[in-house]
Regions:
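Metal-dependent polysaccharide deacetylase catalytic core of the NodB/CE4 family, i.e.
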Residues: 53-56, 69, 75-163, 167-171, ...
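A conditional alpha-helix N-cap/helix-loop micro-motif detector
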Residues: 91, 195-199
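N-terminal pre-catalytic segment of deacetylase/amide-hydrolase enzymes
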Residues: 4, 8-58, 65-68, 76, ...
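A short, acidic, amphipathic alpha-helical segment used as a generic capping/interface helix at domain edges
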Residues: 198-209
Length: 248
């Protein structure tokens, strides 16, 4: 009899766990990886902001020559992107352009000083690298008090990186194909727009995000021609804008 009760308790417990994750599991796309599962589980326990509304943003990595294409797309659609800069990759012209755009309302995020392997670094080394990037931008006239987002190079996510970013009071973008529950979480997933991205599938994700009042972060590598699609980037931003997601 005791065995039957134990079995019943186990079954009820498993059903409760499955039910919990079923209702709270976030929207995901693409291939599963360790970071996607990690963030999905983390977000399942997140207490959603009661004032949340569906939002989106675009982050373009590496601050290469493709930033001008992103700027053109944003101006046509009527949105403003955030540029994840790598100071060591910047020439004076792009630096001046990004500084001017920040003054116009475009965002600036950090993407390490020279795209180093943060995966193998200590917390202190990551903090030092963040400080070095901020100092570079500050010296060139950027408003570094407005920079509060770190896009980890290589999408690495280690305890040292998380601790370093938290120490700086910033949020981080990781390599997880997850729609975020809202903007209050400290780690954000991101959906990349590439040449092979399915527009209809992405529209479906955006509609579900709107229904759940989620926060969609899109990513692009505008400076990698083999990956970047200006046409799909513009179309997806228009869809997000048209179905009612607000720009973060």
């Amino acid at each position: 009899m005791k065995m039957q009760y134990r079995l019943l308790i186990i079954i009820v417990g498993l059903m409760a766990v499955v039910s919990f994750f079923y209702w709270r599991w976030p929207i995901m796309t693409g291939k599963l990886n360790g970071q996607t599962i990690y963030l999905a589980v983390l977000n399942s326990f997140h207490v959603k902001d009661s004032h949340a509304h569906p939002q989106f943003m675009l982050i373009d990595d590496d601050s290469g020559k493709g930033i001008y294409k992103i700027r053109e797309i944003c101006e046509r659609v009527g949105v403003k992107a955030t540029f994840a800069v790598v100071p060591a990759f910047l020439d004076s012209a792009r630096c001046d352009s990004l500084k001017k755009w920040q003054q116009e309302g475009y965002g600036i995020a950090l993407h390490s000083y020279d795209h180093g392997r943060w995966k193998d670094w200590t917390k202190e080394e990551v903090v030092s690298d963040i400080d070095r990037s901020l100092a570079f931008l500050r010296e060139r006239g950027f408003e570094t008090n407005k920079i509060n987002l770190v896009v980890t190079p290589g999408f690495y996510n280690t305890r040292a990186i998380r601790s370093a970013v938290a120490t700086k009071g910033m949020k981080m973008i990781m390599g997880a194909n997850v729609v975020n529950p809202d903007t209050t979480t400290s780690q954000w997933g991101r959906l990349f727009i590439k040449k092979e991205t399915d527009i209809d599938e992405t529209r479906g994700v955006l509609l579900r995000a709107k229904e759940k009042k989620g926060f969609v972060v899109f990513g692009t590598h505008s400076s990698i021609p083999d990956e970047f699609s200006a046409e799909k980037t513009e179309e997806i931003l228009r869809i997000a804008h048209q179905i009612g997601l607000k720009l973060k």
